[in-house]
Amino acid sequence: MSLPHSLFLVIFGASGDLTRRKLMPALIKIHNGKRFPEHFAIIGCARTAYTDETYRAYLKEELIKFGFLTKEEMETLDDFLSTVHYQSMDPADETTYFLLNDRLKELSPQYENNGNYLFYLATPHLLYELIPKCLHDAGLLKKPGLKRIIVEKPFGYDLASAQKLNKIYAAYFKEEDIYRIDHFLGKETVQNIMVTRFGSTIYEPIWNRNYIDYVEITAVENMGIGTRGGYYDGAGVLRDMVQNHLMQLLAITAMEPPAKFDKNGFRNEVIKVYQSLRPLTDKYIRDNVIRGQYIAGDDRIGYREEKNVRPDSRTDTYVAMCLYVDNWRWQGVPFYIRTGKQMPTKVTEIVVHFKPAPMQMFQMKEGFYKGEELIIRIQPDEGILQRIAMKEPGAGFYMGTMEMDFSYDQHDQETGDAYVRLLEDSLVGDPTLFTRSDAVDESWTYFDKILDYWKKHPETPLYGYPAGTWGPKEADVLINRSHSEWTNPCKNLTHSNLYCKL
């Protein structure tokens, strides 16, 4: 795979928060690394009435004001912005796409572009159905030239809507040209899970039911919903986080080694994990899925006091559940996943708990030995920590634990932004780390059963938990069934902006 000679990156939603905070800072890094095509331009599209000059001035002010740039990026900012153009249009108005087509034709001679377009949908998801058809009807998908499209989550609201979207996109794009982006897969530590698993003779032989007791996957935030009340109250955290982000982390943790690490080999193994999940029955959902909603705690308001949230809302802001991957490698090993808003800290990590030795001849001075752990910290402070058994210094043979850790920050290694990696992959046409349509269908097929159960059984408990705590106590009961407890990086009601030690 290689860069095309020329390419236009067309961003819908160019005046929005995602473009300002994530896309433009990532694109500057790619520009400075000289990893753009030889002839490359960015065309921002939104309703705001900018010109090329005023849009560049807006971006420059925003990027400087919010401190997104390094010293080197500040020095090259004007050079980068010279590749940025703007077309005022309404993505919801199909007639304005002809204006975009005319603009791209106008710019094509300057950039030697023969119709190579990469479209990025940084828009509200309600426009996802409309935009592909409008692109087609305005002649923007005509040959010659490559045509690719990047779509942010959520890709669908449920199985039916996801299948409808897949059908719409398949009518206008090849599957290999549809890039359903999940920024978790662009994170260095997530990709490193596969290297640790399949490239290490220490972990590869023991990564199975014979040596692993249980696995935790946590992805929580210390903020509420902010200004997203209108969207979030109709979605909830199961749709917003579990169906996509946590499922990807589960798949990478549990997948078999692909026969070949390419766009199909990797994603085929992801699908196999989804298909191996223990089927959900009503009883299983009752016993193994906990949902919650944050209430006022300390100095934080409750969910129902948030802007644009119904005062009697039953929307989930916390979900914990126990899953099983029913295959040869993982039979009987519980995977505990949880995600929530208004937690004590922001952290995403995977904790692999290994089984204790079959006979313990050494005692702990205090407490009991829980077994060794491998902690994979995805954000913040990306790194890996291994807790292993070690003799306590002094007389006797008392057992304790020692921590061996690696942090990218401590070794001055730049992990890079997830959007940098994923944008680079889309530029060269590598969809390996993007979600395939069949994975979307499999994931929604699984979680639709939980959503349907909640809809049919409105009496299903929605447990309140004070903002700033680790969620409802019922989630602790869920994991305590395996004589276990959640791995919490810090205590309840920690309101510091500082991240917790790995």
Residue ranges of model-derived segments:
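Secretory/organelle targeting and membrane-embedding segments
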Residues: 1-151, 155-502
